[in-house]
Amino acid sequence: MAQKKAVTVKGKKATNGEEKPLAKRVTKSTKVQEEETVVPQSPSKKSRKQPVKEVPQFSEEDESDVEEQNDEQPGDDSDFETEEAAGLIDDEAEEDEEYNSDDEEDDDDDELEPGEVSKSEGADEVDESDDDEEAPVEKPVSKKSEKANSEKSEENRGIPKVKVGKIPLGTPKNQIVFVTNLPNEYLHKDLVALFAKFGRLSALQRFTNLNGNKSVLIAFDTSTGAEAVLQAKPKALTLGDNVLSVSQPRNKEENNERTVVVGLIGPNITKDDLKTFFEKVAPVEAVTISSNRLMPRAFVRLASVDDIPKALKLHSTELFSRFITVRRISQESISRTSELTLVVENVGKHESYSSDALEKIFKKFGDVEEIDVVCSKAVLAFVTFKQSDAATKALAQLDGKTVNKFEWKLHRFERSTSGRAILVTNLTSDATEADLRKVFNDSGEIESIIMLGQKAVVKFKDDEGFCKSFLANESIVNNAPIFIEPNSLLKHRLLKKRLAIGQTRAPRKFQKDTKPNFGKKPFNKRPAQENGGKSFVKRARF
């Protein structure tokens, strides 16, 4: 028993600190346990939970129990055995020191410095990140989106985007087509889709005239597309309920050489009437009518330049009981001067008059260079002679006389200047030129008076008479006051233009563009309250 106690005492001393290897072995096991438990506590970025390794813990009591079990084995009670046991303990302690020193070096290498991540943890993170990257979660979604985008792009390829604006300069004319007879309302994409099947479009230019008719210039990338459109059947050029009219644009100068201007046609004539009338002498390519409904003019384009002389023979012929005028559009206007040109006043208010009849009368006095029949409210025609003596004779013999039941009033042509002319308004129907001369003779010398129904234009020879004439404003002529204002030719021109445009549109009260709240109940806006004023009180309606 004494020997067993001695062995146990030596074992306890070794564990308590006298024998350092045993104590160091215990501390090493606890240190490894701390490191192995601390490292898993720093979770990775991918997975925050990791299994904690369980390491068996050895205490001093367990080691003592193990040694006691070893001591209980049979042996001799001699001193040799005790020395041998002590030697064995020393050898084991030395081996433990070597083993622990190696472990300490390995542990020193495995110890983490501040801010350092363990290699095993980084490897786990890399493996986890690789697993996450290889996970087929987003790849099918990206493939579907790319497939959907490709399908959308294929659908959009059916109706290409076309630049809307002026056709670029330098575009060959064999790549451009002119489209007319468009419906009043249509979609841009429908028009593009209709012509895109013939070829790739490069530009599209829209036009709208004063009558509201729409037309389009379409430019193709190649001439084959334009040729395909020109050769297409009407069924392939149908937009809505309209069959589009397609032609190739021509040179403006070339068109003018094949075009004649027709005047005095009247406001009720149509394009078909003119086309039928001129096709009696030559093929007609196109007919257009000006928007001025008071004094409209027509432009007839023939198929060939050689047919122009045939069309000019229709000048001064009768169309629907009206004598029309026909001349070249490129005809240079003859310069009118006061020495050679006489103005024939439209006393009879004729809407048309035969130029041949006028020529028969005026050629008695000399060679006539031009007779321009106008048939406006004030002027019937301008007669230009080749010599000034012929104009003087005609003015002296015809002015104020009646020939062939026609009252002639002539005066020399003067450039229209409103510098010394006044406009007299509010005249009665029985007012005459003599009545106005009685009023304005006191102002100054009168050059001319032109009666225009309830209006009159009085022109003075000097500025003094023009200035004094305004003193006669509100004078009484035939029991009615007259009103005087400067005669502005620009004003008359603008008023006529507005009147012509207004007649082609609906009455103002039916125009939606002039009334933004058309058809809506009016909104009575509450007046703003002033600072310090009384609050608004809405009154009851009775």
From Swiss-Prot:
Stretches assigned to the RRM domain: 175-251, 258-331, 340-429, 420-489
Entry keyword Transmembrane helix: no
Origin: domain of life: Eukaryota
Entry PTM: The N-terminus is blocked.
Keywords, in A-Z order: DNA-binding, Nucleus, Phosphoprotein, Repeat, RNA-binding
Record function comment: Its capacity to bind DNA and protein(s), and its differential expression during development suggest a role in the regulation of gene expression during Drosophila development. It could, in interaction with other factors, be required for the translation of instructions provided by pattern forming genes and controls, via chromatin changes, the activity of genes critical for the process of morphogenesis of several embryonic territories.
Biased composition, class Basic and acidic residues, residue ranges: 136-158
Any one Gene Ontology BP term: regulation of alternative mRNA splicing, via spliceosome
Record InterPro entries: Nucleotide-bd_a/b_plait_sf, RBD_domain_sf, RRM_dom
Biased amino acid composition, Acidic residues: 59-114, 123-135
Gene Ontology cellular-component annotations: cytoplasm; nuclear speck; nucleolus; nucleus; protein-containing complex
Region of interest: Disordered: 1-166, 505-542
Keyword DNA-binding recorded: yes
Pfam families: RRM_1
Primary location recorded for the protein, binned into one broad class: nucleus
Subcellular localization: Nucleus
Protein name, entry field: DNA-binding protein modulo
MF terms (GO), sorted A to Z: DNA binding; RNA binding; sequence-specific DNA binding
SMART domains in the record: RRM
Residues with Phosphoserine modification: 42, 44, 120, 129, 142, 304, 330, 443
